[in-house]
Amino acid sequence: MSPSAPANSAPDPDRNGVPDVGPASAAPPDLQTAAARAAWLRSTLQHHAHLYYVLDAPELPDAEYDRLFQELQAIEAMYPALRTADSPTQRVLGQVRDGFVVVRHAVPMLSIRTETDTEASGAVAFDARVRRELELPDDAPPISYATELKFDGLAINLRYEHGVLVQAATRGDGESGEDVTQNIRTIGQIPLRLRWAPTLGADAHSLPPEGARFALGRPGGETGAPDLAPAVLEVRGEVYMRRDDFEALNERQRERIARGDKGEKTFVNPRNAAAGAVRQLDPAIAAQRPLSFFAYGLGEVQGWALPHTHAGLLDALAAAGLPVCAERAVVQGADGLVAFHQRIGALRDSLAFDIDGVVYKVDSLALQQRLGFVTREPRWAVAHKYPAQEQMTRLLGIEIQVGRTGKLTPVARLEPVFVGGTTVSNATLHNEDEARRKDVRVGDTVIVRRAGDVIPQVVGVVLEQRPDDVGEPFDLYQRLGGRCPVCGSAIARPEGEADWRCTGGLFCAAQRKQAILHFASRRMMDIEGLGDKLVDQLVDAGVIRTLPELYKLGVAKLTALERMGEKSAVNLVAALEKSKQTTLARFLFSLGIRQVGEATAKALARHFGALDRVMDASVDQLQAVPDVGPIVALSIRTFFDQPHNREVVEQLRAAGIHWAEHEASAAADAAELPLAGKTLVLTGTLPTLGRDAAKDLIEAAGGKVSGSVSKKTHFVVAGAEAGSKLDKARELGLVILDEAGLLALLNEAEADADADAEGLPDSPVAPT
């Protein structure tokens, strides 16, 4: 749906007797008929644009919206006097400008104080300051606070006069900003006319109780009542870009760059992309950028007696058709502030957009007035940040790491910088193409990002700070002289792939070490005590060259190593012996076949039932396995076509690695497993079963465990502290099980493998 024609919304509403005067009409309508029809079309299109952009609940098919939109365009072309500033046809218009007009804010756009303490004590300190300023005794009730997110975007002031958007301006220096009205009109979430209704009128006492729903305007005339809307209402908020929209935008930019389009570039982060779009001189370009908006406050107001609380004010703005973030709350005292800060901190990485903190505001507008301002900052509000997820630092060098499969990864060596709650000195550059695309050079000032548990990465270069003596553009092949930095083998870049690889295989010590660590990992052979430091010793000392040699280790060989005591050696030998009894799926996963992860290994084991059948399967036979495509099938076939790999497999079997016969399921049997074809999602903490144990039980019964909830999900298994997955399951009306319900499902399914999963109404179900 384009910003100029938001093409998604609902069955053609009741026309309220207004005749259709669109292009299909036999004769041009008179002015009075056209005016009535145009008013109805504006109202209807605004209503459905609100459903689509703000409520994410479209009702009108795209084609029907487009038909109504085109009819309005035709009327306005026929009678230009009927073209109003709030018409949906006016979202994208105007000429390319030479520059922006500076406008003065009627009420300054002041910034709020930032709490430098990012811990819980920062919230406690703010509450203590407010209570002190209000001279409250220690036994006074806790203060009510409105808590919100601190969006990482561009602050904007929207000026509505009698309910119609007439101007949009940036914050600028707080006193004056730039007029960006034409660009802001392209943002579908921002209403060109407010949905004002009598209950939002100037009489403060006519407002419904806080928390009640405000009455909304309805289609069938102009939305709301323009004569009831405030004479002036300035709405402050943030223009931002969602993460998924940002990724899609950058993907389009990369395609344009690949085509050779001049002047195109990718964007470093969503904030820069949003700010750049708002300040585009050509509104047609701004319209192509996927921008969003959240309202969070007011500027100048004339003709509206405000609600008594900040939360009530935001409710009113939402009822008037403005997008207001749902992640907000009214909390009590310091404890409430701390809880909100911690809750949002846990959600931060899963939000659809970037934030850099939360905002606390005294909820009572009367108390806000009492507290006032100090040095142009409100005493009644504060921004409480989280540790920054992006920081700037200097690139000291680029090293090349060799992975388990021979992949060569460029790694940035950085001046240490505190980002994402930890000190970072290394960050991935992913591959040569990414390093070149970002034009990363030694000596550059770079932007490093670390969010949650994500590996730190260099996301861009600050070109304005590039020194004159900066290094050359990165060329991996030239840098290495075409040879692996560990073993000296030739490197190659397979056609169609982004990664260079060492061709040395297990001859390469780096690949050998990574292959051993992979083989010994918990979800593979689970050899307890075989960690990276010990593997380094074993490989560097020449004790281990191949995987089968692990099972020739004895206490004497191990105790000969530095810092290896007899007890540790005995424990490791016992762990090696224990690992010999495994499953076919674990064994396949442990071999480190490219493209074969845990799920694929389990699918292969279920489908073929025996290792020899997997090793001898053709590419076509492999593609018959669920979720195995041509690339994965070719990778498996290539692995087992190598004599060395077959020899390793036979030596491991000869060393005593085995799996129980009953675990081998022929392809025909796989389809008859009790949960075959069923998809389950695990969320939260189960009382007795660990996540891995629950996953194993489900997969052993033929079910598939997915990481996300969708309409294709059959069951959601929810434990304590289940989050957004449980909420989505409820929205979709899916069957929700607790641990007891899961076990009952497995038992009942096993007793009757032909039972339809939806025919199990007696299974214990978690409360919804």
From Swiss-Prot:
UniProt record similarity statement: Belongs to the NAD-dependent DNA ligase family. LigA subfamily.
Write one Gene Ontology MF term.
Answer: DNA binding
Q: What is this protein called?
A: DNA ligase
This chain's source organism reads Leptothrix cholodnii (strain ATCC 51168 / LMG 8142 / SP-6) (Leptothrix discophora (strain SP-6))
Q: Does the keyword NAD apply?
A: yes
Annotated keywords: DNA damage, DNA repair, DNA replication, Ligase, Magnesium, Manganese, Metal-binding, NAD, Zinc
Which InterPro entries does the record match to this protein? BRCT_dom, BRCT_dom_sf, DisA/LigA_HHH, DNA_ligase, DNA_ligase_AS, DNA_ligase_CS, DNAligase_adenylation, DNAligase_N
The record's section on SMART domains has: BRCT (SM00292), HhH1 (SM00278), LIGANc (SM00532)
Please note every region of biased composition (Low complexity).
1-11
Region span, Disordered: 1-28
The cofactors required by this protein are: Mg(2+); Mn(2+)
Pfam families in the record: BRCT, DNA_ligase_aden, DNA_ligase_OB, DNA_ligase_ZBD, HHH_2, HHH_5, Nlig-Ia
Instruction: Please give the GO cellular component terms listed in this UniProt entry.
Output: cytosol
Q: Which top-level group of life is the source organism from?
A: Bacteria
One GO biological process term: DNA repair
Q: Which reaction does it catalyse?
A: NAD(+) + (deoxyribonucleotide)n-3'-hydroxyl + 5'-phospho-(deoxyribonucleotide)m = (deoxyribonucleotide)n+m + AMP + beta-nicotinamide D-nucleotide
Which residues are noted in the entry as NAD(+)-binding? 62-66, 111-112, 148, 171, 238, 361, 385
* Residues annotated as catalytic: 150
KW Acetylation (keyword) present? no
> Where, by residue number, does Zn(2+) bind?
484, 487, 502, 508
Question: In the record, what lineage is assigned to the organism producing the protein?
Answer: Bacteria, Pseudomonadati, Pseudomonadota, Betaproteobacteria, Burkholderiales
